[in-house]
Amino acid sequence: MLDPKFLRSELEMTAERLATRGFILDVERLSKLEETRKSLQVATEELQASRNAISKSIGQAKAKGEDVAPIMAQVGSLGEELDAKKTELAALLEELNAIAMSVPNLPDESVPTGADESENVEVRRWGTPKEFDFAVKDHVELGENIGGLDFKNAVKITGSRFIVMKGQIARMHRALAQFMLDLHTTEHGYTEAYVPLLVNEDSLLGTGQLPKFGEDLFHTKPATEEGQGLSLIPTAEVPLTNLVRDTIVEEDNLPIKLTAHTPCFRSEAGSYGRDTRGLIRQHQFDKVEMVQLVKPEDSMQALEDLTGHAEVVLQKLGLPYRTMVLCTGDMGFGSAKTYDIEVWLPAQDTYREISSCSNMQDFQARRMQARYKGKTDKKPSLLHTLNGSGLAVGRTLVAVLENYQNADGSITVPEALRGYMGGLKKIG
């Protein structure tokens, strides 16, 4: 969430910057609420001061042998009035907090202004799409012909947007995840983590999925008097980032770089009718996630580094891609700046997103109270948090199948994966 003090003091400027994201901040309502808050705050403080002053006079009256009943009655009356004002103030602060929770992050000044994805800006491109001398097949046809992608049984077992993988395809899927983890831990300096696939509401609030995006989640256990509800993770970003919730990290331990391979679960509530064929948009999919926790002055360079780490995966696999900086109107809710990496898919004759790398700055950290402190610092400061896919495993499998297909329907195994597949050079 945004800094409430900054939001109140820079209301007009904040509204202007949020408008570039297509978010309309109700300035008039917030201004009125802020005026009321100030008034209630002053009234509460004045009542508290009056009550304290009169309470002190009780002892003095007793010492003089005077009747303290009238003073006690006055203190009681002030106490009731004070409690009423405190209740009113608490309700107002709760309303202001709810508004703050619904406001997206401010775009960084380096982000291009635009309304939607059509105004994203390409920053670089790597590799040249292969020209095939035969009619290319898409990953669905390739995988089904090999006997490794079974959509029919997935529908029977669960429903649409699920997959059963078997044989050499399942092995390649596993090999891709292992390759990514090994690359990030041995060459990019990340620490591998194994994390829960179920998270509570505080965790989802911390990273920004709640309260705004609850419909995108698979909820497995509702909240009760005994505890919070639990939901399946939409991304390992949630458990990884929440490792520092309510924590003060020593500055010497920064940066913290974490990676994890997990299944991810998304209802795709807003994606009806999109990418209904194949593995591009599934309710359950695997992803290798990267998270960095850094000092504020280091976060923009960390975003460049993290994006580069995701790009190296594609380079080592020999998959052509382009990197886009998202415009203000296409960024995620909590992001201050995002790069999307899009891989070339021959069957679609276009680039498709395979990784999204974002700098959240202190947006998540403020929600989580994730802070750091140097040896000479008097007070802790908020961390900056970053996350990115390194990569989406299923979409990477799609890219390998389509880019490495042969005329006979077989798939050449990329050299980077052969050590993970027993030396196989082809499958199918």
From Swiss-Prot:
Organism field: Shewanella pealeana (strain ATCC 700345 / ANG-SQ1)
Xref: InterPro entries: aa-tRNA-synt_IIb (IPR002314), aa-tRNA-synth_II (IPR006195), aa-tRNA-synth_II/BPL/LPL (IPR045864), Ser-tRNA-ligase_type_1 (IPR002317), Ser-tRNA-synth_1_N (IPR015866), SerRS_1_N_sf (IPR042103), SerRS_core (IPR033729), tRNA-bd_arm (IPR010978)
Description of its domains: Consists of two distinct domains, a catalytic core and a N-terminal extension that is involved in tRNA binding.
GO molecular function, one term: ATP binding
Primary subcellular site in the record, as a coarse category: cytoplasm
Organism phylogeny: Bacteria, Pseudomonadati, Pseudomonadota, Gammaproteobacteria, Alteromonadales
SUBUNIT field: Homodimer. The tRNA molecule binds across the dimer.
Binding site for ATP: 266-268, 353-356
UniProt-recorded name of the protein: Serine--tRNA ligase
Encoding gene per record: serS
